[in-house]
Design a protein with these regions (language model features):
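Helix-loop "lid/cap" segments that line or gate small-molecule binding pockets
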Residues: 74, 92-95, 104-116, 140
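Hydrophobic alpha-helical bundle segments that form small-molecule/ligand-binding pockets
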Residues: 115-118, 129-154, 190-191
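Hydrophobic alpha-helical connector segments
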Residues: 71-101, 153-157
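Amphipathic C-terminal alpha-helical segment
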Residues: 96, 111-114, 138, 158-175, ...
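Hydrophobic alpha-helical segments that form the core
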Residues: 104-107, 147-167, 179, 183-186
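Short, basic, alpha-helical segments at the C-terminal edge of helix-turn-helix-like DNA-binding modules
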Residues: 60-66
């Protein structure tokens, strides 16, 4: 088996995460994902017997894992500084994509499958959001907040960032994101 074929499953999952971020859940077909991944269509179903839902659930998990790593890196220091770094990375992603790329985890969370398929991608999104909340809660707790306050702030931060990304994509303008980012950093720094 060539190296190109042996890494086909990873390329398929990565391509699916990109499609989720750009086009959403229902527009991400297995055929188009395989094409973008330059993977054989037939072998895609061999590697992913659960079909589209399995591919998209794994893509959602992969996207979440990448953000886990970014959060871990950003949140090594003080929470306000770490949040600023994380927001700067998201800001760059929005601008670099000309506002065409959003969060694949949010896409998996908010779209219902158009068929009666299981909602594996939504469940994967819920697990990812829970991990992000836990990371942020821990960082905010290290900064002296009570567990309850830290958890509430973590939920608000995630929801605010996701909403700001959606608003900036809709308006093709970084303004909504920048305003939300400034408020979040100010709120987290306010002790």
């Amino acid at each position: 088996m060539s190296a190109r074929h042996s890494d086909a499953p990873q390329r398929v999952v990565a391509a699916a995460a990109e499609m989720l971020a750009t086009y959403g859940l229902n527009a991400s077909s297995v055929r188009e994902v395989a094409k973008r991944a330059q993977a054989p269509f037939g072998s895609t179903y061999h590697h992913f017997p659960g079909g589209k839902q399995q591919v998209l659930a794994e893509a959602t998990t992969l996207a979440g894992t990448k953000v886990d790593a970014l959060l871990d890196t950003c949140l090594q220091g003080a929470a306000p500084d770490g949040l600023s770094l994380f927001l700067a990375a998201w800001r760059e992603r929005l601008i670099r994509s000309a506002f065409h790329v959003g969060c694949p985890v949010l896409a998996a969370a908010v779209e219902e499958p158009i068929d009666d398929a299981p909602d594996d991608a939504r469940r994967a999104a819920a697990e990812v959001f829970a991990r992000w909340e836990a990371r942020l809660t821990e960082a905010l707790s290290r900064g002296g907040r009570s567990p309850e306050q830290a958890n509430g702030m973590a939920t608000m931060i995630i929801a605010s960032i996701e909403g700001a990304v959606a608003m900036s994509r809709a308006t093709r303008d970084i303004g909504p994101f920048d305003r939300v980012a400034a408020q979040l950093v100010s709120l987290v720094a306010d002790r």
